[in-house]
């Protein structure tokens, strides 16, 4: 299912002056296309950084994902753990989405990672969020940490964050009716999509 977003604010509010967002939007038009194939191809070209991540806590749901990630991060860091985090959307700067061992990713490093991903991807089609996830995955694989907290962007089963091969914990927050055009018309269908992050 491929649906062009009518505007950058449709599902993922961003600030138009953010240079990272401008770069991603210019090179990779923002399209919602729920599949993992493009990202799998790109990560293979990058030598599979998703295979070298710290233990992952993956959070899906309709309500409370961001709060749950924030609570988990606070608890883990209070216990002395180094924690990577991926959340969305951001408020002011795209760098707010990625924390490396407790600190926001620095813009020059993120640009470097995006350039590496763009070079590996070439002219192949890819979405805004998939390219961002590829860059974040490189960072998470290269910077040591004890845990990685991933917040699902949309749904779960075909969300770009579900590229990870395994999780330490999968968390489902309260589920409601949302994004029916992508996830289904019933609560059961939507729950099934979000439960797609659960792995053996």
Task: Name the predicted role of every residue range.
Residues 57-59:
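Hydrophobic anchor at the beta1->P-loop junction of P-loop NTPases
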Residues 11-12, 30-32, 36-45, 49-54, ...:
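ATP-dependent carboxylate-amine ligase catalytic core
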Residues 162-174:
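Inter-motif core of Ras-like GTPase G domains
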């Amino acid at each position: 299912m491929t649906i062009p977003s009518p505007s950058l604010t449709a599902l993922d509010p961003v600030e138009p002056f953010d240079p990272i967002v401008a770069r991603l939007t210019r090179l990779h038009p923002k399209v919602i296309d729920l599949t993992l194939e493009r990202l799998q191809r790109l990560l293979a070209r990058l030598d599979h950084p998703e295979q070298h991540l710290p233990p992952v806590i993956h959070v899906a749901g309709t309500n409370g994902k961001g709060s749950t990630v924030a609570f988990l991060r606070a608890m883990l860091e209070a216990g002395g753990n180094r924690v990577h985090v991926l959340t969305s959307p951001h408020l002011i700067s795209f760098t707010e989405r990625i924390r490396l061992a407790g600190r926001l990713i620095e813009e020059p490093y993120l640009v470097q990672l995006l350039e590496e991903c763009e070079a590996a991807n070439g002219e192949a089609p890819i979405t805004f969020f998939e390219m961002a996830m590829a860059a974040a995955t490189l960072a998470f694989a290269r910077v040591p940490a004890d845990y990685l907290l991933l917040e699902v962007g949309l749904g779960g089963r075909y969300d770009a964050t579900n590229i990870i091969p395994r999780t330490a914990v999968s968390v489902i927050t309260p589920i409601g009716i949302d994004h029916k055009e992508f996830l289904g018309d019933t609560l059961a269908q939507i729950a099934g999509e979000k439960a797609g992050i659960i792995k053996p």
